């Protein structure tokens, strides 16, 4: 059976085979079917056609008649059809449910333009390209059908000795129908690939000027970032259209007889192209070659972002060989297209039948023009694109590389600094001393008083044990560092939100998971530089209900419905007058309840909405539960980062989301970046690799950026997500960024302007960590401003590995993270909240000395709508090349090598306790660099938590180790540092250390499957965790244990000063016993 025997009935109601049997001998016309030959080995080859068509065989001539399979019955056909129809309907309904609920979600947030713009663009591109490719295919096929010869035989192939026809007669009308169907199928398939690049098209039509031009062609950088990617996409689409056109043309001509190919039989074969077919194919070929040439021209501009062995961008060989050759090859490609196209259109040697040997001989003569043209183009291409650049690089550039590449290296330096925001770095020489003198910190008293001792990663378990209250709450495994005004003084603060953790529930069911336990409660904040006498964080905001310095406002809303840990959907809202069933917070009885009053999610009061969400989440409870009522809302996609990613999918989001109390509400702050990989000459960087460090490797809360190459980045957007109602606000932060300006045009009304940021919110806008990590990665090389010095690479630096990590992690080059600290650096008149890091020499040298200290001012100020003047100022303090200031790794080694430190740490680690070393901070103080590292002690019990017990300090090669930072600083600065670190009060009687916030007593508050609260087993009003209050409510046993611990600490200090290590060991043992007793009583 031939191809058209099978598919002919789809286009001819009477069937192709019946029509063939009715055919009468007459002069063929344009609508006559084409006769395709069926030959055997015994024939003499194809015979010339005559006016009377030969009788057509019903199929290929074969020796045995195959058994035909039984046709399915009508009942089976109907059943299969019904099943397929149901599957399609169900699939469409599920897709509809997903789409409609997405529209409801975006509409509720006020970002419906995002989904409609995306959908409209993607569907529009898909349909436009599908129509174009279908139109091209249809036109190409129609032209080929129109050009069919008046009389023609078909083409044949030979299979296993039999000559088989590859087509059967078909009318022009049927052929057009086939062309329409195939064209549409091809168009829809390739159109779906084209719509994925919707953002490039939108940016091209909303392009902005950068105001700077590339140094090679003098074109505005906006052309490369916005226009060029779109042009490349369009040219790729055009190339595919033209390729489809020529393929449709050739295939249709073969089927219509315009091209006839018969396999050789007894040495005879046939290859023939009609004149009209030659013209069409020649034109299509020229168009394809022109498109190829245009793509080559566009490729020239890509050389400016091409990654080389040393830099990104066009180097000497590229500029002087590759780029000119590309223009030459584009011209050659276009000329070759003309030559080949004209030859095909005018050649008369492609007709007639002849033996294969004769045909080969004729072909060599007849095809001389295209053969010579193609061969010449290949030779020229090899010489120009391969040999010439290699020879130029080998014999001219390499021997004089520094001189010949300096211009292009300088271009790379300048462009990289501009693209990464490094062009305004304030660098200064810092001649650091390593000799600590008495009173050296007198001029740095304010910075010294703000040195943060609490490690945000180590103290997370402490937060959980002291403030979690119940097992269904949790805190981030790395708490955030921010600053707050407490009693009129700016304080470095560690802060975390008490998030809901459904995994902690004992009684998991649909009612509890989705209607009862719906939210977390409040934030917990502690001083960054203060602890209690027993080493616990000193909270100034804590407890349930929350009390403290941050939430004394009556309008404070503590409930946390939206948070990184809220992964399940919740259904909230109840009719007026109905008793609340949402669990609010634990109390001494059944627990307080609450009903959500905000506008946080799509309303699902009607049956249609409930049905849609039941399908989306695969839960019939949404349809049938009484908890779903006319006032119900469904909250989902509750992670702040996820919400911002959905409303601004074109942004790259920072790896850390942090909470802040702003104007009486808890807000999650998310930093958004605009990026590009098309900034001319700027160095390409893998953002994922550049933002990895020890924190991202060990934390579930903090992550690196997604791995992708970029050579331009700006922190253009600050986003906030309200923890209560999930509302998202996007603020244009960098108003000079052309990329965010383009997105503002694409999504008008989506952004708030800088002037709309309140003063309270402004005070919590920090310089983002991921951007700083990318910048420090680049600045390790690009602090070098001279092309010649850059070429030598002798002054390149690197970020040190984290010396507090395990040996295995250090071998994997896990980098030290940057740290937020309040300090005073060169050029600043007073201490500034800053993000800091340090540098050591690049390479594998074992001598790890400090080469530079990097900081960026992270305080955005507190004025409404105005960013602080120093915010974002990057300061680099470069140490002299002959400096011997230890780097972080060497400082850690000095700590480890100290006999006194090792002895005390061994004593602390004896028994059932473990020592944990906190973050190693580097601070420019006292004319040099001070290293500060808190030391925590943690017992081995499952409910234990780290307590700050000691502080390590290093200055030069001098090491201090004491109970407080004050004492440790005094040890390395001649007995008196001249400044107070503010933590001397941390050592003393625990009865004098009162927390600033209390935890209300709470019960389990579990809920049964029917939604009613279980009667709590703990009804004595006491919580299972520390309430942060060491006042009169403390039990007598607990007070005695803490008093014993305080006395043991005093005995330890006295023994250490006398050098009586035996007494010191006894005191430490007593201290551990007292702490274990206190912890046991606390639990």
Swiss-Prot record:
It comes from the Bacteria. It is a multi-pass membrane protein. The chain crosses the membrane at residues 78-98, 125-145, 178-198, 239-259, 281-301, 325-345, 372-392. Residues 991-1013, 1050-1060 have a biased composition (Basic and acidic residues). Residues 1-72, 976-1061 are annotated as: Disordered. Coiled coil: none annotated. The keyword Membrane applies. Keywords: Cell membrane, Membrane, Transmembrane, Transmembrane helix. The keyword Membrane applies. Pfam families: UPF0182. It is found in: Cell membrane. CDD domains: MFS (cd06174). InterPro entries: UPF0182 (IPR005372). GO terms for cellular component: extracellular region; plasma membrane. Belongs to the UPF0182 family. This is UPF0182 protein BAD_0641. It comes from Bifidobacterium adolescentis (strain ATCC 15703 / DSM 20083 / NCTC 11814 / E194a).
């Amino acid at each position: 059976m031939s191809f058209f025997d099978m598919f002919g009935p789809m286009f001819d109601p009477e069937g192709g085979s019946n029509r063939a049997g009715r055919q009468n001998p007459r002069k063929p016309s344009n609508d006559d079917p084409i006769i395709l030959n069926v030959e055997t080995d015994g024939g003499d080859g194809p015979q010339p056609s005559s006016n009377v068509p030969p009788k057509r065989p019903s199929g290929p001539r074969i020796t045995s008649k195959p058994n035909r399979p039984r046709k399915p019955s009508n009942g089976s056909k109907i059943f299969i059809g019904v099943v397929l129809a149901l599957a399609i309907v169900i699939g469409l309904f599920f897709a509809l449910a997903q789409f409609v609920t997405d529209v409801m979600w975006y509409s509720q947030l006020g970002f419906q333009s995002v989904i409609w713009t995306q959908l409209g663009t993607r569907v529009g591109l898909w349909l436009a390209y599908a129509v174009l490719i279908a139109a091209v295919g249809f036109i190409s096929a129609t032209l080929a059908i129109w050009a069919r010869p008046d009389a023609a035989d078909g083409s044949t192939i030979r299979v296993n000795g039999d000559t088989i026809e590859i087509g059967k007669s078909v009318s022009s009308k049927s052929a057009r129908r086939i062309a329409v169907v195939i064209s549409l199928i091809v168009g829809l398939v390739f159109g779906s690939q084209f719509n994925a690049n919707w953002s490039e098209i939108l940016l091209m039509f909303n392009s902005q000027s950068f105001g700077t031009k590339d140094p090679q062609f003098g074109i505005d950088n906006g052309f490369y970032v916005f226009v060029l990617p779109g042009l490349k996409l369009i040219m790729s689409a055009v190339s595919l259209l033209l390729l489809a056109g020529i393929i449709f043309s050739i295939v249709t001509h073969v089927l219509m007889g315009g091209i006839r190919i018969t396999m050789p039989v007894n040495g005879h074969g046939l290859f023939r192209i009609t004149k009209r077919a030659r013209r069409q194919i020649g034109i299509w070929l020229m168009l394809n070659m022109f498109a190829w040439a245009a793509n080559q021209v566009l490729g020239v501009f890509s050389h400016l972002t091409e990654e080389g062995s040393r830099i990104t961008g066009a180097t000497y060989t590229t500029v002087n060989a590759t780029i000119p050759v590309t223009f030459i090859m584009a011209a050659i490609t276009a000329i070759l297209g003309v030559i080949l196209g004209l030859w095909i259109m005018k050649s008369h040697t492609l007709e007639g039948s002849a033996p294969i040997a004769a045909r080969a001989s004729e072909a060599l003569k007849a095809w001389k023009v295209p053969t010579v043209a193609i061969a010449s183009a290949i030779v020229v291409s090899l010489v120009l694109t391969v040999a010439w650049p290699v020879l130029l690089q080998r014999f001219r550039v390499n021997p004089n590389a520094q001189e010949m590449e300096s211009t292009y290296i300088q271009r790379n330096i300048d462009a990289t600094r501009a693209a990464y925001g490094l062009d305004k770095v304030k660098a200064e020489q810092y001649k650091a001393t390593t000799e600590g003198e008495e009173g050296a910190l007198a001029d740095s008293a304010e910075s010294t008083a703000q040195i943060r001792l609490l490690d945000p990663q180590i103290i997370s378990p402490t937060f959980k044990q002291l403030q979690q209250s119940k097992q269904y709450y949790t805190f981030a495994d790395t708490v955030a560092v921010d600053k707050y005004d407490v009693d009129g003084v700016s304080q470095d603060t560690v802060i975390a939100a008490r998030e809901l953790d459904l995994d902690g529930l004992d009684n998991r069911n649909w009612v509890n998971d989705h209607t009862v336990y719906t939210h977390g409660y409040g934030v917990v904040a502690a001083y960054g530089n203060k602890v209690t006498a027993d080493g616990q964080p000193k909270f100034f905001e804590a407890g349930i209900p929350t009390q403290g310095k941050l939430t004394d406002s009556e309008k404070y809303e503590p409930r946390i419905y939206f948070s990184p840990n809220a992964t399940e959907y919740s259904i909230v809202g109840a009719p007026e007058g109905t008793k609340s069933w949402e669990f609010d917070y634990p109390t001494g009885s059944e627990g307080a309840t609450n009903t959500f009053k905000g506008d946080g999610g799509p309303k699902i009061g009607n049956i249609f909405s409930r049905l849609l969400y039941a399908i989306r989440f695969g839960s019939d409870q949404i349809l049938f539960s009484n908890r779903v009522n006319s006032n119900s809302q469904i909250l989902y996609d509750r992670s702040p980062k996820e919400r911002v990613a959905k409303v601004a999918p074109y942004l790259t989001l920072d790896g850390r989301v942090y909470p802040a109390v702003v104007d009486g509400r808890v807000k999650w702050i998310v930093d958004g970046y605009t990026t590009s990989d098309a900034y001319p000459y700027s160095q390409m960087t893998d953002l994922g690799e550049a933002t990895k460090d020890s924190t991202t490797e060990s934390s579930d809360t903090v992550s690196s950026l997604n791995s992708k190459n970029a050579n331009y980045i700006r922190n253009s957007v600050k986003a906030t997500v309200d923890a209560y109602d999930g509302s998202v606000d996007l603020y244009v932060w960098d108003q000079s960024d052309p990329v965010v300006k383009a997105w503002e045009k694409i999504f008008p009304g989506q952004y708030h302007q800088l002037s709309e940021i309140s003063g309270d919110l402004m005070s919590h806008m920090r310089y983002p960590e991921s951007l700083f990590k990318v910048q420090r990665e680049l600045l390790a090389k690009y602090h070098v401003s001279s092309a010649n010095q850059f070429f030598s690479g002798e002054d390149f630096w690197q970020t040190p590995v984290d010396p507090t990590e395990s040996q295995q992690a250090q071998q994997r080059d896990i980098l030290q993270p940057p740290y937020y600290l309040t300090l005073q650096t060169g050029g600043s008149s007073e201490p500034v909240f800053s993000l800091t890091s340090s540098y050591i020499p690049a390479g594998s040298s074992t001598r790890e000395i400090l080469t530079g200290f990097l900081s960026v001012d992270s305080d955005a100020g507190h004025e409404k709508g105005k960013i602080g003047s120093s915010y974002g100022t990057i300061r680099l303090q470069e140490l002299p090349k002959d400096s011997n200031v230890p780097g972080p790794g060497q400082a850690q080694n000095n700590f480890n090598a100290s006999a006194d430190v090792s002895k005390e740490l061994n004593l602390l680690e004896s028994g059932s306790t473990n020592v944990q070393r906190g973050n190693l901070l580097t601070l420019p103080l006292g004319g040099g660099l001070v290293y500060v590292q808190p030391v925590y002690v943690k017992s081995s019990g499952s409910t234990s938590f780290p307590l700050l017990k000691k502080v390590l300090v290093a200055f030069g090669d001098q090491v201090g180790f004491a109970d407080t930072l004050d004492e440790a600083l005094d040890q390395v600065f001649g007995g008196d540092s001249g400044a107070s670190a503010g933590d001397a009060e941390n050592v003393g009687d625990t009865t004098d250390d009162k927390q600033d916030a209390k935890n209300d007593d709470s019960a389990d508050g579990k809920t049964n499957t029917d939604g009613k609260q279980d009667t709590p087993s703990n009804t004595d009003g006491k919580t299972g965790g520390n309430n942060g209050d060491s006042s009169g409510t403390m039990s007598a046993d607990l007070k005695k244990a803490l008093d014993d611990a305080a006395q043991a600490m005093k005995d330890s200090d006295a023994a250490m000063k006398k050098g009586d290590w035996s007494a010191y060991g006894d005191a430490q043992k007593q201290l551990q016993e007292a702490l274990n007793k206190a912890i046991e009583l606390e639990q």
